[in-house]
Every structure is written in structure tokens, then in C-alpha cells.
Swiss-Prot record:
Cellular component terms per the entry's GO annotation: chloroplast; mitochondrial large ribosomal subunit
Keyword set includes Transcription: no
InterPro entries per record: Ribosomal_uL16, Ribosomal_uL16_bact-type, Ribosomal_uL16_CS, Ribosomal_uL16_dom, Ribosomal_uL16_sf
Keyword Transcription regulation among UniProt keywords: no
Family of this protein: Belongs to the universal ribosomal protein uL16 family.
Gene: rpl16
Keywords: Chloroplast, Plastid, Ribonucleoprotein, Ribosomal protein
Main location: plastid
Subcellular compartments: Plastid, Chloroplast
One of the Pfam families matching this protein, by short name: Ribosomal_L16
Gene Ontology MF terms in the entry: rRNA binding; structural constituent of ribosome
Source species: Huperzia lucidula (Shining clubmoss)
Protein name: Large ribosomal subunit protein uL16c
């Protein structure tokens, strides 16, 4: 599962999920992509589940690019703990995803297989998604 090797600080504020994605919203590497339509936190487990679904369906063919990385630590307090006594310890990592963000890209496989693989991965995501195809101009710029 994905997680940072080291961070400057162990804990982070939760933050807000406002606005749309201004970066990472265009196809850069592959021909087909899975794009988020809602804001959410996507955990490293969910990212890995989606990656496995795509690679298993594609069966060695083509290449997959994961365009998100879980760099936000989420802390959890122990069960039945009284109020106070500080913030909990980091439990898992999430990626903050805004609408328009590309989650996965796939290239080197036929469109039917790519669409089916992306659909399986989309079921594993906590957000509504859409499958987009790179235009010929975008393919030239790669």
C-alpha cells in the first residue's frame, strides 16, 4: 500500500473539500483515464484495490499510471477514550481528491478492455467517476 517514506509533520488538520481540481485533471500518460466527479478522501487501500482490479483485468497487457498519492495522515483515537488527552495517533493515509481529478490512466490495451477494467476499478472508489478518452491532440503532446 502507498504511504510517504517520511513527512515533515506526523499529524495534519482535516481541512475542507471545496472547489474543483485545477491540477491533475488532464490525461498525460495513457489513452484512457478514470476521473473523479465528487470530492472525497481516497484511502491507500482503495487506491490499491483499484490498481489490482485494473491490472488483473488487463492481464499483463498495457501500462497503468496511478495519478494520486495518499499523503495525508488520518488519526484515530482508541475506543472508549475520554475527551481531551490530545489527538490520536496516525492510523492510515488518504489522498484528497477534488472533482475533475484523474485517478488512474491506462494505455496500450484495446478500448473495450480498458473500459471494462476502469468500470471494475470505479466500483472500488468512494466517489462517482467517469471514463475519459484522450483526444488525438492530447496523444500528440505525450
Amino acid at each position: 500500500m502507498l504511504s510517504p517514506k517520511r513527512t515533515k509533520f506526523r499529524k495534519q488538520h482535516r481541512g475542507r473539500l471545496g472547489g474543483v481540481s485545477t491540477r491533475g485533471n488532464r490525461i498525460c500518460f495513457g489513452r484512457f483515464a478514470l476521473q473523479a466527479l465528487e470530492p472525497a478522501w481516497i484511502t491507500s487501500r482503495q487506491i490499491e484495490a483499484g490498481r489490482r482490479a485494473i491490472t488483473r483485468y488487463a492481464r499483463r497487457g498495457g501500462k497503468i499510471w496511478i495519478r494520486i498519492f495518499p499523503d495525508k495522515p488520518i488519526t484515530v483515537r482508541p475506543a472508549e477514550t475520554r475527551m481531551g488527552s490530545g489527538k490520536g495517533s496516525p492510523e492510515y493515509w488518504v489522498s484528497v481528491v477534488k472533482p475533475g481529478r484523474i485517478l488512474y490512466e491506462v494505455g496500450g490495451i484495446p478500448e473495450t478492455i480498458a473500459r471494462a477494467a476502469m468500470k471494475i476499478a470505479a466500483y472500488k472508489m468512494p466517489v462517482r467517476t467517469q471514463i475519459i478518452v484522450a483526444t488525438p491532440i492530447e496523444m500528440q503532446n505525450q
